[in-house]
From Swiss-Prot:
This is Polyribonucleotide nucleotidyltransferase. Residues 693-723 have a biased composition (Basic and acidic residues). One of its GO terms (molecular function) is polyribonucleotide nucleotidyltransferase activity. Mg(2+) binds at D488, D494. NCBIfam families: polynuc_phos, PRK11824.1. Residues 555-614 form the KH domain. SUPFAM superfamilies: Eukaryotic type KH-domain (KH-domain type I), Nucleic acid-binding proteins, Polynucleotide phosphorylase/guanosine pentaphosphate synthase (PNPase/GPSI), domain 3, Ribonuclease PH domain 2-like, Ribosomal protein S5 domain 2-like. Residues 692-723 are annotated as: Disordered. It comes from Listeria innocua serovar 6a (strain ATCC BAA-680 / CLIP 11262).
Length: 723
């Protein structure tokens, strides 16, 4: 049995311990991370033999357990089901800095699983899982060029903070996750409140200093318990075959890559590949399938090398653009007549149609995960159908990529969404990618800005996004603006930056090399700003301000404030009162605990009617006020008059007229309208009314006057007698 070993350090003011040797001993490597009261187990397993195919089969799983926060899962089965969006995004977050650190040609399957056992809300389980993934790999026998680490960075009043608490995060204007090795940054994910490029770069470099310390900490663990790395057979092409294929195809491939239009370029490249493959099929080789697979791989590498050489040496891109040139832009709003807002954004051969839907606040999304229960009134969803790239295949539920791109767009736009008080609506954006040749996630951000302006959402400022690329050969590097699909596929970086004219609102960086220096990051951010401002200028030329009026098909929401103690009156016993209002008017009603009432309907007349009913219900009678109401009930001692919805008062028989009244029915009948004056509201809230107080008193002869006894119209409640 392996002996448990514990390694500890301090991390953002909390104790961080890494335990190895006790749990998950059959995995290639495993580590239990304790960070504050957060506990995460990460296990890594690598297959002994390579898998067929021309890609690296790495799988990262992040499993949230509801028991970690003392909750029982909902639903009929009462057990964890499909991963939440947050779990999916965390798995992507861990995958991205780890993947570049496996050798090229590595084909053995690697699976990393992080299981959340306990959650301290101020100690991020995501960052613990990222650290655990690195530790599990570096102490295993799986060849991995780590360690890596990741940290969260915030900025409060100009001061940068590592792993901010929930309270600190609410005050922060930057929400950044950065990961990398001791030497360089290789993954960034950020949201921000329109911060400058300089502030974002400083936040990244501030985080890298803490990453260095965590990498040094892991080196101590490796020295104590690290296993010797196993020998792995890397996929390497046969040198003679490679030279042969290169000689036959290089010139033709170079010419094909320079074809500017995407579909024509793809066809030209495919023609070159088919010609070479057919020539090998004609040889009728004994191991034909294996040779053809290797030739196909060599041809793809030639395509990659030629594109990179063209950009790096000639500074020419496959479509003929300069390195900082943006593709042609076009946009349109109001395409769809019955939706609340729509925007079509096209950049080259990438096109996104975004649709904005407005709904009452009650239709917000409830997120019941490992954190506190959250209510989300702004959502952005991204769909990527296969026809957008001219392919066929089954249409499945949104995958990791679609969830990730939707979340990136949401993060980019959320800082310009008006507050609930300014605009009391739930806002859902859906971006449909209709055509894609790179940067579709950023096109969805631009389309969503157009859709919200078209819908009349008073956003603080328009937001645009741009994807930057990089080709690095040795010390020479070229930064590309507005990358297309081929440049993304064969390039070294996908660096997405979104923001307003005043600053960055979202940033995401993935790279395929070991890491990036501060200089490259700085230049990429500066070049991205130029591109973003160019795109924003185009967007505002299409629509510069939110529409003054909402769509005729959007719900109109009116806000009313009532006293919190009156909420029960509006709702009524068992919801009877509020349901009656909804049935009568067809509106939707939401009531907050502070007494804010939201009334929503496409019909403004019905909104006003519902408001009038509620105002009547919560209206308070005042002594001395005069009302006209209807007689709702008659008793021997008087008539009950409805002053307004939900409020009745009693006109005692003696208050009907100055003269003596024998029967109530002699003066009033059921359903009669009568004007009365409030003469008393007793300690139980009962209202006493008078009709005669509004009538002229007839003079009586002195002899006819009789002293009148004082009358109490509602019987007083007696206190129980003490025995």
């Amino acid at each position: 049995m392996s002996e448990k070993q514990v390694f500890s350090t301090e991390w953002a003011g909390k104790t961080l311990s890494v335990e190895v040797g006790q749990l998950a001993k059959q995995a290639s490597g495993a580590a239990l991370i304790r960070y504050g009261d957060t506990v995460v187990l990460t296990a890594a397993v690598g297959s002994k033999k390579p898998r067929p195919g021309d890609f690296f089969p790495l799988t990262v799983n992040y499993e949230e357990k509801m028991y970690s926060v003392g909750k029982v899962p909902g639903g009929f089965l009462k057990r964890e089901g499909r991963p939440s969006d947050r779990a999916t995004l965390t798995a992507r977050l861990i995958d991205r800095p780890i993947r570049p650190l496996f050798a090229e040609g590595f084909r053995n399957e690697v699976q990393i699983t992080s299981t959340v056992f306990s959650v301290d809300q101020d100690c991020s389980p995501e960052m613990a899982a990222m650290l655990g993934s690195s530790v599990a790999l570096v102490i295993s026998d799986i060849p991995f060029e780590g360690p890596i680490a990741g940290v969260d960075v915030g900025r409060i009043d100009g001061k940068y903070v590592i792993n901010p608490t929930i309270e600190q995060a609410e005050k922060s204007d930057i929400s950044l996750t950065v990961a990398g090795t001791y030497d360089a940054i290789n993954m960034v994910e950020a949201g921000a409140k329109e911060v400058s490029e300089e502030a974002m770069l400083e936040a990244i470099m501030f985080g890298h200093e803490e990453i260095k310390r965590l990498c040094e900490f892991q080196q101590q663990i490796i020295a104590a318990v690290g296993k010797e790395k196993r020998e792995i057979e890397l996929f390497v092409s046969d040198p003679e075959l490679e030279a042969e294929v290169k000689a036959a195809s290089e010139g033709k491939m170079k010419a094909a890559i320079k074809t500017e239009e995407k579909k024509a370029r793809e066809a030209a490249i495919e023609e070159v590949k088919e010609e070479i493959l057919e020539s090998y099929k004609a040889k009728e080789l004994e191991n034909e399938a294996e040779i053809l697979g290797e030739v196909a791989h060599i041809l793809e590498m030639i395509e990659k090398d030629e594109m990179r050489r063209l950009i790096s040496q000639d500074k020419i891109r496959p479509d003929g653009r300069k390195v900082n040139e943006i593709r042609p832009l076009s946009s349109e709003v109001g395409m769809l007549p019955r939706v609340h807002g729509s925007g079509l954004f096209t950049r080259g051969q990438t096109q996104a149609l975004s649709v904005c839907t407005l709904a009452p606040l009650r239709e917000h999304q409830i997120i019941d995960g490992l954190g506190t229960e959250e209510y989300k009134r702004f959502m952005h969803h991204y769909n990527f159908p296969q026809f957008s790239v001219g392919e066929t295949g089954p249409r499945r539920a949104p995958g990791r990529r679609e969830i990730g791109h939707g979340a990136l767009g949401e993060r980019a736009l959320q800082y310009v969404i008006p507050s609930e008080e300014e605009f009391p609506y739930t806002i859902r954006l859906v971006s449909e990618v209709l055509e894609s040749n790179g940067s579709s996630s950023q096109a969805s951000i631009c389309g969503s800005t157009l859709a919200m302006l078209d819908a009349g959402v008073p956003i603080k400022a328009p937001v645009a996004g741009i994807a930057m690329g990089l080709v690095k050969l040795g010390d020479d590097y070229t930064i590309l603006s507005d990358i297309q699909g081929m440049e993304d596929h064969f390039g070294d970086m996908d660096f997405k930056v979104a923001g307003t004219k005043d600053g960055i609102t979202a940033l995401q960086m993935d790279i395929k090399i070991d890491g990036l220096s501060r200089q490259i990051l700085d230049e990429a951010l500066t070049q991205a700003k130029e591109g973003r401002l160019h795109i924003l200028e185009h967007l505002t030329s299409t629509i510069s301000e939110p529409r003054e009026e909402l769509s005729a098909y959007a719900p109109k929401i009116i806000t009313l404030n009532i006293k919190p103690e009156k909420i029960k009156d509006v709702i009524g016993p068992g919801g009877k009162q509020i349901n009656a209002i909804i049935e009568e008017t067809g509106v939707k009603i939401d009531i907050e605990q502070d007494g804010t009432v939201y009334i929503a309907s496409q019909d403004q007349a019905m909104n006003r009617k519902a408001i009038a009913i509620i105002e009547d219900i919560v209206r308070e009678v005042e002594v001395g006020e005069v009302y006209t109401g209807k007689v709702r009930r008659i008793e021997k001692f008087g008539a009950f008059v409805e002053l307004f919805k939900g409020t009745d008062g009693l006109v005692h028989i003696s208050e009907l007229a100055h003269e003596r009244v024998g029967k109530v029915e002699d003066i009033l009948k059921l359903g009669d309208e009568v004007t009365v004056k409030v003469i008393e509201v007793d300690h139980q809230g009962r209202v006493n009314l008078s009709r005669k107080a509004l009538l002229e008193k007839k003079e009586q002869p002195e002899g006819d006057k009789k002293p009148q006894a004082e009358k109490k119209f509602y019987p007083k409640t007696k206190k129980p007698e003490s025995k």
